[in-house]
């Protein structure tokens, strides 16, 4: 946000992982226009408004889509209310980067329908291109992939039904890719450096926290009105579906009714397939269906949390709930009501006797009562009111469950990161003199305490640089994961750096990689964790701050260097004393005396622009603690020089004896060409949308 306020594109994030791509982290949505709201209202309020706006867009978009597909005003309204009340949607509101793509799904399907069915003109093509671009820019790549997948199935149904529109769809797709080109290229560029470039393994994808657990499947899908922690009840935070028993039953009625209708089958079949596939894929890599998708669908293997497919399952189900409300009179048929009752009894038996549980007898009893209520409604209500009453039951059940939804459980009196603890406040002051920080503080607890304890990435709130960080995507680079072996023989590469540290911490290696400050929670004994560190520099009732005596500096001149060797990080861990004065880069520097590296003055003007002042009495390798990747350009005294990769991760340049001003600037070569293409495509799309038709 600070970069945007200065009219700069934040290509890099200087505060985590020793500087990593920021624009290339698709989930951040740097180029997503609604993010500008945060510039006007501040980060906390601004992102709250963004979430509210997207919830409105999701609900109203669902109403519009339902009406376009032939639902009644009642069915459309119920679908719109249900889609914002279900647990999978409510949970995503605390992750703005995930609710944003989901909010576009109904509008994207609506725009696809308009583009294919338009009789003439190109206005609908331009509208679809703009909506598709909004989707591509909107946030988390896994959710974008899910939305695009649903849209692809829906498009197949459209083509089969209307047998036209391929050219129009192709033009819209081309324009949307062109408009999103700067972001797409940044994402691909970042992915090429990421440790997950080859995709995630089945072992990673089988993590119980990231899949729908069979035993708790009913709990995750039906939810409960008994209160308690939704994440614990569902098996995991990401597994919260909470569609409600009434919602699932009425949605099932809607699926059957839509599939039976020849006029609705073209769209109901793809969306029913979305629900089936989404549920199967949410179970993780335990079925052939998942394996096939893992092998064949581009990007499918990059999604860490399989259970996130429940989000699009919920959106599709909400639409079918609207259909079910419209088709509620079918329950007046004894044959249909008996079939439904039999299905409910079968599910109850599976939950009661099988591997799937209800969590508690009370929850199971409430599920049965709710199902019975759905069956009773057609008997006691007037035929013309059956749909309204069923819709009311669904909405009330979801509304009651939403009282204990995740957003209502993590509310705080003040904005996250609004205040720092006394120790962290002092650290913010002394850290202005340089050095990065690592925090050995709790990984669980109240959200405001996690932020004050500098949980990885939270240090950004306080303008504190760190070699540590947390991300499930492209910001975990290959050089960074390889560097972890300098601190541990068996590092946890999917977790923050601090998870690979044991007592006592490797002070010399941390100092070499720029770590000057250590924050300890008071449950850790300093004599055990940082026995050779100076301090405490600051302390309070929760934390203490310590200074590393082996810190080399943010920028350093090395006088001894040799080419990199295999297993470099292991050498730095096990044989550090023999290489403490030697840097590893594609350069040979011999030194016989006074070989210890020298700290240099450096200024970070922006994340993408650094200036280093060096005065050396012999040839040296000047290094700064910033990750080296494509896009960096270096000059020495105004003349371009080659940038070198040092110690497998940082950027450096070779200089001769003398005084030097070294400048490092980052901007990828593809940026301006991509911007020109994007602006041109936007102009074309806008002309399509707003041009006036000339009639004779």
Predicted regions and their residues:
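Active-site-proximal, structured, solvent-exposed surfaces of multi-pass membrane proteins
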Residues: 8, 280, 349, 579-696
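C-terminal substrate/ligand-recognition segments
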Residues: 46, 50-53, 244-257, 261-286, ...
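Membrane-embedded helix bundles of polyisoprenyl
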Residues: 56-69, 73-160, 168-187, 193-194, ...
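Extracytoplasmic
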Residues: 199-205, 210, 359-367, 383-386, ...
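Selective detector of the "anchor" transmembrane alpha-helix that sits immediately C-terminal
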Residues: 49-63, 245-252, 269, 670-693
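Contiguous transmembrane helix-bundle modules in multi-pass membrane proteins
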Residues: 96-103, 115-118, 123-133, 143, ...
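Periplasmic/ER-lumenal interhelical loops and adjacent helix-loop junctions
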Residues: 1-11, 173, 178-258, 280, ...
């Amino acid at each position: 946000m600070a970069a945007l306020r200065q009219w700069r594109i934040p290509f890099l994030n200087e505060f985590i992982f020793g500087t990593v791509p920021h624009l290339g982290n698709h989930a951040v949505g740097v180029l997503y226009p609604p993010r500008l709201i945060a510039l006007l209202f501040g980060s906390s309020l601004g992102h709250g408004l963004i979430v509210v706006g997207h919830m409105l867009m999701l609900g109203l978009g669902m109403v519009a889509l339902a009406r376009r597909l032939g639902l009644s005003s009642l069915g459309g309204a119920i679908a719109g209310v249900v889609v914002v009340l279900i647990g999978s949607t409510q949970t995503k509101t605390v992750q703005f980067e995930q609710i944003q793509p989901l909010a576009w799904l109904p509008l994207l399907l609506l725009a696809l329908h308009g583009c294919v069915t338009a009789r003439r003109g190109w206005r609908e093509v331009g509208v679809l291109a703009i909506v598709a671009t909004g989707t591509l820019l909107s946030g988390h790549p896994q959710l974008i992939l899910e939305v695009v997948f649903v849209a692809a199935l829906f498009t197949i149904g459209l083509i089969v039904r209307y047998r036209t529109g391929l050219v129009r769809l192709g033009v819209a797709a081309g324009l949307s890719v062109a408009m999103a080109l700067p972001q797409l290229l940044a994402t691909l560029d970042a992915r090429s450096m990421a440790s997950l470039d080859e995709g995630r393994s089945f072992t990673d994808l089988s993590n119980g926290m990231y899949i729908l657990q069979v035993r708790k499947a009913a709990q995750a899908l039906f939810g409960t009105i008994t209160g308690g922690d939704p994440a614990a009840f569902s098996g995991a935070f990401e597994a919260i579906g909470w569609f409600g028993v009434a919602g699932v039953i009425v949605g099932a009625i809607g699926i059957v009714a839509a599939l039976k209708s020849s006029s609705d089958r073209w769209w109901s079949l793809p969306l029913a397939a979305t629900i089936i596939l989404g549920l199967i894929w949410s179970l993780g890599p335990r079925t052939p269906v998942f394996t096939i998708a893992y092998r064949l669908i581009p990007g499918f293997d990059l999604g860490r949390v399989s259970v996130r497919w429940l989000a699009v399952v919920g959106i599709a189900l909400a639409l079918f709930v609207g259909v079910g409300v419209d088709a509620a009179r079918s329950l007046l048929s004894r044959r249909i009501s008996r079939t439904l009752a039999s299905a409910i009894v079968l599910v109850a038996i599976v939950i009661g006797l099988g591997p799937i549980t209800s969590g508690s007898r009370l929850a199971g009893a409430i599920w049965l009562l709710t199902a019975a209520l759905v069956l009773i409604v057609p008997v006691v209500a007037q035929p013309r009111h059956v749909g309204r009453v069923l819709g009311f039951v669904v909405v009330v059940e979801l509304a009651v469950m939403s009282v204990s939804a995740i957003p209502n459980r993590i509310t705080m009196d003040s904005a996250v990161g609004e205040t720092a603890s006394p120790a962290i406040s002092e650290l913010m002051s002394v850290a202005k003199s340089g050095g990065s920080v690592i925090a050995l503080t709790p990984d669980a607890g109240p959200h405001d305490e996690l932020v004050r304890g500098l949980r990885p990435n939270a240090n950004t709130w306080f303008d504190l640089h760190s070699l540590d960080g947390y991300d499930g995507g492209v910001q975990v680079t290959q050089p960074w994961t390889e560097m972890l072996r300098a601190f541990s023989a068996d590092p946890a590469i999917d977790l923050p750096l601090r998870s690979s540290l044991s007592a006592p911490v490797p002070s010399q290696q941390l100092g070499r990689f720029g770590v000057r400050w250590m924050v300890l929670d008071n449950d850790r004994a300093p004599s055990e964790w940082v026995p050779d560190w100076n301090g405490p520099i600051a302390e309070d009732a929760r934390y203490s701050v310590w200074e590393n005596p082996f810190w080399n500096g943010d920028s350093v001149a090395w006088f001894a260097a040799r080419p990199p060797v295999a297993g470099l990080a292991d050498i730095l861990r096990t044989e550090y004393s023999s290489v403490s004065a030697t840097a590893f880069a594609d350069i040979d520097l011999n030194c016989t005396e006074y070989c210890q590296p020298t700290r240099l003055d450096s200024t970070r003007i922006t994340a993408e622009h650094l200036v280093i002042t060096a005065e050396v009495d012999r040839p040296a390798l000047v290094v700064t603690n910033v990750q080296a990747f494509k896009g960096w350009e270096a000059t020495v005294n105004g003349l371009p020089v080659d940038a070198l990769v040092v110690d497998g991760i940082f950027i450096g340049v070779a200089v001769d004896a003398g005084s030097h001003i070294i400048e490092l600037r980052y901007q990828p070569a593809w940026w301006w060409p991509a911007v020109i293409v994007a602006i041109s495509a936007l102009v074309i799309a806008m002309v399509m949308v707003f041009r006036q038709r000339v009639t004779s």
